A protein has these predicted regions:
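Phosphate/ribose-recognition catalytic cores of enzymes acting on nucleotide-derived substrates
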Residues: 1-100
Length: 100
């Protein structure tokens, strides 16, 4: 169950995910899967460098920045290409006010 969930506007986001006391970078999408004619609101998170089965575990999502709005793609290849670009942005994202 989604307890105490506050979701941002539809789109693709850079996120940090806390699981079991550890933080991981990832990207998440909120919205309807319009490329595949989806009409239900969905939340999906991709945690980078992470391969554990955590279904049923509690996680915390920290919404860091919006990458883009949800887009309907003409085909799966276009979607995959965009997701690869989104991942590149999310992996190397740093806060604007970070002086390091």
């Amino acid at each position: 169950p989604l307890d105490r969930v506050i979701l941002p506007a539809d789109g693709v986001y850079v996120v940090d995910v806390e699981h079991d006391g550890k933080m991981y970078r990832g990207m998440a999408s909120v919205g309807k899967n319009v490329t595949f004619e989806g009409d239900e609101l969905r939340f999906e998170a991709n945690i980078f460098e992470f391969s554990q089965d955590i279904y049923g575990d509690t996680i915390r999502i920290f919404w860091l920045d919006k990458i883009r709005d949800m887009v309907k793609f003409d085909n799966v290849d276009e979607l995959v290409k965009q997701l690869q670009a989104d991942e590149e942005i999310a992996r190397y994202w740093i806060p604007e006010n970070d002086n390091h």
